């Protein structure tokens, strides 16, 4: 029986445009789905817009339109952008649908019947001007732990502390600017902690990548809190069935959108919903997500499914973040690039599909879009290697042989090598290691180009006695080109379609790797792909800079990046003097940054693994994400405070503090206002700084 797979990508929020960072996931998923379909798998790709929440409601109010009108407009924009990058959803829906309401309500009622829903009265902050309870992210104030200003209502991006919004000092509503008041409200909680035994087993069953499974152990060690799944009116979403005036929190009904999208698709195509989503379904369910939403997909979602009587995910594949030129995407640098602005500049979407594929390796590592490398790699690989094979040989078929390939091939061994690579390349695609797949394919392209260079068809064409040889050489070259096209088709579907029309062949499937391409009339060759002009990339960056609207300068107290380290241990004003004995208490050590990575759910922090010599490895959270890409830090030496008391943070234990210099005005002229300290050459990990 052939495989049956239901594949999803995370649902983009209907409150903004698709940008190049989003596209990493959708391109990654689309390549995998296209590969599966080429292999003959019954594979369906579902997605939808995530449409509920306070942010949607407030934006619609600001634009003086209904939330429904807003999400319909954004849905049209998203579907247009996805189509522009050849993302081949089988169905793209909306979480604001009858199907989603039905399935979210059924899941909730099943969890309630299972004793996993409890009701508690909690104190919340309430905006007396807008008459609404404020979500955590719509409250700003001073961190109750370190005193940093302008922090969100749930966690501090300076010291990493987590807290209740009611603990925030001097809170202000981000909606109206009013001072919130305390107000009690009944809320509904999913008892996630009661599901821990199941989740511990499920997360170590091979469903997650190894690095994701390891992350789960950290969260288990910290303890699983019950999950608030309700919000008070006014709220744009679905009302809880037995709780008037209470609405499902957006993160409850968002993943249910996967089910709802398929439910509508199944209805339209006569499919059995339970055969795909039922408890005993044999269908593979595969979720592609960003690593920032791993908590929801590896804990909340499987627990919801398990205890509501549904099947569980077969696999949850998380990918890393995108940086551009080694740094976080930036509007001021013109590297916060939307999908539409890329397309509006006339850039080929398959250039980006290829480049992302060349970087994606199936892990949670971040990938970098280096714009200079982007130009060089696409021009070299796709035009200089792949397209070059056809452009140097196809013309002779029409000029000399009436557009028909030879009856046989003279180098069956070389073609056999290309055919034999099909299984290896397929294994790389299956494992989502597209980088390895493309390296294999480009190595074959090099072999094909060497064959053409050795045979010199342009020289053979001058010799009437070599006409038979010319025919065979060009036929062999086009056989190799056809096989390369087949292998690249999941990544370059539009280009593959153009090649299929040029070669006058049916749509390529994976089994076609076994066949020869002879005695076939082909169409006249026309140019298949142009090189990237570096000026077009510069124009895109400039266009994204020019599209910026002026924004107010941030409050001077904000500068979380510059305060990130000092705020962890501030005990006295900076003007106070200390004795040499006080200073001697601080154990400063040289440390080598062995690893650096983004922290899920934190906008400013990086997780650093430090080698401190005889003191061993240390984990430190540093608020330097705005200034450094993780990969730029690995291997560097820096200075750390080694005897700072360990601090339990939301994301794990921080075992010290690295030192950094800061610009008192934050960023100036787009130069990061934060600089980690590095010792002179000769310093080694563990050495004391005196």
Curated annotation (Swiss-Prot):
Swiss-Prot/TrEMBL GO biological process terms: methionyl-tRNA aminoacylation
Reported cofactor(s): Zn(2+)
Binding site for ATP: 331
Subcellular location field: Cytoplasm
Molecular functions (GO terms): ATP binding; metal ion binding; methionine-tRNA ligase activity; tRNA binding
Heme recorded as keyword: no
Keyword Membrane: no
Binding sites annotated in the UniProt record for Zn(2+): 143, 146, 156, 159
Domain tRNA-binding: 582-690
Sequence motif: 'HIGH' region, positions: 12-22
Catalytic activity: tRNA(Met) + L-methionine + ATP = L-methionyl-tRNA(Met) + AMP + diphosphate
Job description of the protein: Is required not only for elongation of protein synthesis but also for the initiation of all mRNA translation through initiator tRNA(fMet) aminoacylation.
Matching HAMAP family: Met_tRNA_synth_type1
Subunit structure and binding partners: Homodimer.
Protein name as annotated: Methionine--tRNA ligase
